[in-house]
Amino acid sequence: MTLPPSCRWSGDHLELLDQRQLPGAVVFMQLRRWQQVAEAISSMAVRGAPAIGIAAAWGVVLAARSGDDLLTAFRGLRASRPTAVNLRWALNRMQAAMGSSASVDVEALTDAAAALQREDCVLTQRLVDHGVSLLAQGCRVLHHCHTGAIATGGVGTALGVIAAAHARGLLRHAWLDETRPRLQGAALSAWELGCLGVPCTVIVDGASGLLMRRGEVDAVMVGCDRVSANGDVANKIGTYNLALVARAHGIPFYVCAPGSSIDRATVDGEAITIEERDAEEITHVRGMDVAAPGAQVWNPAFDITPAHLVTGFITEFGVLRPPYREVLSELPLPNQL
């Protein structure tokens, strides 16, 4: 089965894959206003840091086509999710495409958004090729959250590496954390790998330690929403736990990080804003109440994994090894300020 794109431009509107409907149905939302794009981002209809950035870029195009105030649109889109730096990076690209002219060039903005999406397709393929080079014949890889094709504009990042390893005859098995509370691993990663015929098993998040202790994992590969200047990683809640357990068992822990996710303006992980989401994501599953009435809830969407727990960063530039502050400072990244 061919995987659907995360989004596609259709002449005068954006067609956005509604990931909330998966794995039950493949549904594309028809978006014609930037406010709809912002809502799709904040409600997690679109997920994955690269896909969020691409969607936001098309949101700017919709604002320009509608004659909306672009400053308001930029602010609204930027605020839709605070942790993923790709969102800011994409919006900065769109601001640069506007130039210094007082008039709004809709065609130039459309070209800029399309170019950003095409580039992501190329860059993710490069990243995946570098990642596959780390894996040995018969490898078993553990993955957290969802980092597949529909989370990007191309083949995906960490899950793309797993899929490519299977296609090249290297992968023995993929283990997928279910990834509470939104179940991205069970709903999205398992769906993508199933479509591609990749052998995989979904596990509860807390089972990863037992799996490693039994010698069933050769590598852990995850994506990221932001990498700070020193190599600290903001990613889906539970990533830090996974990195600690991997270190305890001597298992390499790799972070797939496209250049758009690397934020050299943020000194370390402590400076990264951690999004906190609605309590109902924990107290309810598929609309069913599963928590005791009145139970207090804390629902951070991300955590911070310290750089010293990262074996290597897999990027479109190659595989990066410590010392990360020095290595990251030398990458030819665009200005994200």
UniProtKB/Swiss-Prot annotation:
UniProt-annotated binding residues for substrate: 47-49, 81, 184, 235-236
Keywords: Amino-acid biosynthesis, Isomerase, Methionine biosynthesis
GO terms of biological process kind: L-methionine salvage from methylthioadenosine
Keyword Cytoplasm: no
EC number, UniProt record: 5.3.1.23
Reactions performed catalytically: 5-(methylsulfanyl)-alpha-D-ribose 1-phosphate = 5-(methylsulfanyl)-D-ribulose 1-phosphate
Xref: Pfam families: IF-2B
InterPro entries given in the database record: IF-2B-related, IF-M1Pi, IF_2B-like_C, Initiation_fac_2B_a/b/d, M1Pi_N, NagB/RpiA_transferase-like
Coiled coil feature spans: none
GO function terms (MF aspect): S-methyl-5-thioribose-1-phosphate isomerase activity
Acyltransferase in keyword set: no
Positions annotated as active site in the UniProt record: 225 (proton donor)
Annotated site residues (Transition state stabilizer) in this chain: 145
Pathway assigned in UniProt: Amino-acid biosynthesis; L-methionine biosynthesis via salvage pathway; L-methionine from S-methyl-5-thio-alpha-D-ribose 1-phosphate: step 1/6
Residue intervals passing through the bilayer: none
Cysteines joined through disulfide linkages: none
Family membership noted in the UniProt record: Belongs to the eIF-2B alpha/beta/delta subunits family. MtnA subfamily.
Role noted for this protein: Catalyzes the interconversion of methylthioribose-1-phosphate (MTR-1-P) into methylthioribulose-1-phosphate (MTRu-1-P).
HAMAP family with a match to the protein in the record: Salvage_MtnA
Protein name: Methylthioribose-1-phosphate isomerase
Source organism: Synechococcus sp. (strain CC9605)
Gene: mtnA
